[in-house]
């Protein structure tokens, strides 16, 4: 988490909630899977579909990782979560990033997916601010994740 921000996810309900503060260089929270025990080959899939509730119109990031280096490149897509909705995240549209900074020269290894992550951050990409970010409490219920 960033600075004094904190969050938790309830594995039974999929409710991810917490409090975001900009104190102590904060302004973001995240939740991620543990690295998968063997990479997923998603080469027959076009992307990931997320079904959610309670997003309150906030702008979140969905991250797919093809490396266990959690300080390395990740594949990121931003989405606005209405109260109830579905978002399709095509692999072809994901942005390679390292800590919200875009990078070039990398290719997503669709046959080597090792983790998934959600983030809520005051930053979009390359220092640009998230237009739907507020400090304070947030809630996102992740109802379903599936490949399509």
Short names for language-model regions:
Residues 1-148:
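Beta-rich carbohydrate-recognition modules and glycan-binding surfaces
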């Amino acid at each position: 988490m960033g600075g004094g921000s904190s969050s938790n996810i309830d594995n039974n309900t999929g409710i991810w909630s917490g409090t975001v503060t900009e104190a102590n260089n904060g302004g973001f929270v995240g939740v991620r899977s543990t690295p998968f025990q063997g990479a997923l080959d998603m080469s027959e899939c076009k992307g990931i579909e997320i079904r959610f509730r309670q997003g309150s119109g906030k702008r979140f990031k969905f991250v797919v990782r093809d490396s266990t280096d959690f300080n390395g490149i990740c594949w990121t897509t931003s989405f606005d979560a209405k109260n109830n909705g579905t978002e399709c995240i095509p692999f072809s549209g994901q942005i390679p990033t390292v800590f919200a900074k875009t990078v070039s020269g990398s290719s997503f290894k669709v046959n080597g997916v090792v983790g998934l992550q959600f983030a809520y951050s005051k930053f979009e990409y390359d220092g640009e601010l998230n237009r739907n970010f507020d400090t304070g409490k947030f809630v996102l219920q992740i109802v379903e994740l599936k490949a399509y």
